[in-house]
A protein has these predicted regions:
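...with weaker cross-activation on analogous glycine-rich loops/strands in unrelated enzymes
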Residues: 250-311
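Low-complexity, Gly/Ser/Thr/Pro-rich intrinsically disordered linker/tail segments
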Residues: 313-332
Length: 332
């Protein structure tokens, strides 16, 4: 029987291997591949201490997981809250998403409250109902439930509706394309995924969606580059682009390439529009229009989320990237 879990730390490291490091030509390096955020769901493919389908034994402290957006990896047991399918199905419609770069969960609905947890943009919290008189007494604050059973408070302005779907966590299987898994969970066709997201959140407007994706990406400007990162603490190139799309309701492939079975497909360079993805060898950026793009770069000169340009006349021009640009991807 399939098992499930919820990420129970503000930022959860997802490793590409059951061990946290590996030897490379450069020396010992991390095996980090991604990060899960508090409140997000995953499928547990192999329980801690079990043996994977490939015959790899896991330590009692490590689980093999697949995130709701299709990323496969390994997570420490103590970073997960294991739940039944019924419990997860009950949970998924409830959370709201945090939209600030960092949000404190406080013990009281006032700034002097004890800080219980510090969460990142993209983390999820469930708001608790309150009697009208209690809610009126602390207008501007929302009472929320933490995964460990405690309750706390955050500012109402920090919470927004979740635009992305996590239901693919139930239908993902080996050999099934991600779009097909999500479509199956929602009882629609894969071709309806993007149009339905636009209809639900942007009145069907492609232009509004493109604007929203670019605005989301710009919220990370100045964030440090972190290999495998996907939060305001540090983010990598594909973490930036996939997070911008996710927060706008469309789940794309997590890494820096176009993969069949996901919404992004290649289009001619001349057809690129703001919100499309630019692909370089091992790198991805988000096109902002007028020749400029935003990306998270590990280059020593910047080392984080910056804006650069495809235009040689622009002071933000990066010749090295322009020369290696090999594809433009779009969900339209």
């Amino acid at each position: 029987m399939m098992q499930y879990a919820i990420f129970a730390r503000p930022v959860v490291t997802i490793y590409d291997l059951p061990q946290t490091t590996k030897q490379s030509e450069a020396g010992l390096v991390s095996t980090i591949g991604d990060e899960g955020l508090y409140g997000q769901a995953c499928q547990v493919r192999t329980a801690p201490g079990g043996v994977t389908a490939e015959g790899v034994p896991l330590s009692p402290e490590v689980a093999e997981v697949v995130t709701f957006y299709g990323y496969h990896g390994f997570v420490r047991r103590d970073a997960l809250k294991f739940v039944s399918e019924d419990a997860l199905r009950d949970y998924l419609p409830r959370p709201l998403v945090l939209v600030g770069r960092a949000t404190d969960v406080l013990s009281l609905p006032k700034v002097q409250g004890v800080r219980m947890l510090e969460l990142e943009r993209g983390c999820l919290l469930c708001r608790l109902p309150e009697p009208p008189e209690e809610a009126l007494a602390h207008t501007g604050w929302a009472k929320v439930a933490l995964l460990d059973g405690r309750t706390g408070y955050v500012r109402e302005v920090a919470l927004e509706p979740v635009r992305f779907e996590m239901t693919a966590v139930f239908s993902q299987r080996e050999g099934l394309a991600f779009d097909d898994a999500l479509a199956k969970a929602r009882n629609i066709t894969a071709g309806e995924l993007v149009p339905q997201a636009l209809q639900a959140w942007y009145h069907g407007s492609e232009e509004a969606f493109r604007d929203a994706v670019c605005a989301q990406a710009k919220k990370y400007l100045g964030t440090e580059y972190r290999w495998g990162g996907k939060s305001g603490r540090g983010i990598d190139c594909s973490g930036l682009v996939s997070s911008a799309y996710m927060q706008c309701g469309v789940l794309i492939y997590r890494d820096a390439r176009i993969v069949e079975g996901w919404p992004v497909h290649q289009i001619p360079f001349a057809d690129k529009k703001r919100g499309d993805a630019l692909y370089f060898p091992g790198h991805i950026a988000l096109y902002l229009g007028e020749g400029r793009y935003i990306h998270s770069t590990g280059a020593s000169a910047s080392g984080g989320v910056v804006i650069n340009s495809l235009d040689p006349a622009d002071p933000l021009y990066r010749e090295d990237l322009v020369k290696s640009l090999y594809a433009v991807g779009s969900v339209f």
